[in-house]
Structure formats: structure tokens, C-alpha cells
Amino acid sequence: FKTPSREAEFYKKTEQEKIQAESTSKEIMLYRIPNDGHKILFVHGWNGRSSQFYRIIELLSDNGYDITAVDLPGHGRSTRSITNLPEITDLVSEITKSRGPYHGIICHSFGGVAALNAVRLGATFQKLVLISPGVYEIKPMFKTFVGLFGLDEEYYADRLFDLAESLYGASPGEFGLDRFSNQIETETLIVHCVDDKEAKKEIAVTLHSDMKNTVLHLTEGLGHRRILRDEKVAELVMNFL
């Protein structure tokens, strides 16, 4: 994979450190821009990388925010391997404990699911920013996968749930935002594009309804990823923080 030229400046401006995370056997790449202001953690989405946040990170760091961004296992410049939601959740929790406390966490797509699960398990932030949240319930994902093979969706999704629980010690359904989002009281900004073809805007609308302290901002014409490099979105995020 060749990094887009627009993201090259991100790698020039950040301090880079590979760490051996206790929550995983993999080496994890962290990116830092130290500053005297509030500490902010960035968590990208599935098939993403930290450099996708370059626009928001540049604006925040130029305004004194202290930046940490993480390439998740199997992504970016971290160890190339498979990963899963429980592992990513544990990693976010670990970084929060070892490198925090963080004033805010900014997440894209699937990264928001991991971040909210970390909050469920005890991580604390003053501000949450969810950009293009991508998953609300877990089981429909399993059923969609099974359906691709023409199999009985309900039966085989249940079998996959059983297998995952035996491997990870928790039912995949427990990680679904439908199970706990109404218990999260952290002040949250949700930003979503109405024409996002990868994550339906209804996910953002539902989270806004579920959660107790949210601001919902809907955009147009920015899709699922271009939203991360939009200047107005970056300014919106900074003003919220």
C-alpha cells in the first residue's frame, strides 16, 4: 500500500514509537506531537491508519493540543496480522491507562466501537468524538457474512457467536453499541455524512438518541473517509473540544 501524498506531512511532523503492548503480542506504532495543551487520542477505523486524521491533527497540534495516534494491530505500520474488536478494545484501554489521562478521544468508523467499549470497561474521557460511526449491532454483521454463502443466517450466526465466545471469553453481542450506549454519559460529538455508503447515517442518529449527552452534526458530499480531511469538520471538532 502506498501512502497518499497528502498524508506524507503527517509522518514528517510526528514522533514515532513502536511499543510492545501488554494487551497483545504485537508491536504497535504510536505517533506523537507533544504540546502543552489538552491530550487527545486518535483511533482510526477498520482498514484505516492514523495518517488519515492528518487534517484534524494538524489543526489541533497547531493550536496547542498534545496528540497521540495509534495504528491498530494489523493496520498502518503496526504488526501486520489479523485483529479483532476485543483486542482493539483492550489496546485502547491500555493506552488510555499507560499514556493518559486524555481529555478527548477522536475516532473514525469502527474505531468508535472500540473506544465506546473501552469506556464501557472503565476508560474515561472528558470528550468523545465519533466520526462516521460504522457499527451499532454486532449480530447483523455475522448474519450478512453467513448470508453471502447462502447458509441459514440465524443458525450459523449463532454458531459463530458460540465460537467467538469460546475464543475470547465474551459474547460478540456484548460489544454491540445497542447493548450499552444509553449508559454512556460522556459529552460526545457525532459527525456523519448523509450520503455515506459504508456506514448508514441511521447509526449516528440512533446513537444520538441513545446517548445522554450528544451533539449530532450531519454533513453532505463527504462520504465515509473524505470527511476526515474536510477543513470545516476539523474546525467543528476543535471547537467541540
What are these regions (language model features)?
Residues 1-20:
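An N-terminal hydrophobic leader/cap segment in hydrolases
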Residues 50, 57-79:
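Conserved alpha/beta-hydrolase
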Residues 222-232:
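Catalytic histidine-centered segment of alpha/beta-hydrolase-like enzymes
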Residues 106-115:
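Gly/Ala-rich beta-loop-alpha elbow adjacent to hydrolase catalytic centers
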Residues 82-103:
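Alpha/beta-hydrolase active-site loop
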Residues 123-170:
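Hydrolase active-site cap/lid region
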Residues 56, 177, 186, 200-209:
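Short alpha-helix in the alpha/beta-hydrolase fold that links the catalytic acid
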Residues 183-185, 190-192, 196:
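Short beta-strand/loop motif that positions the catalytic acidic residue
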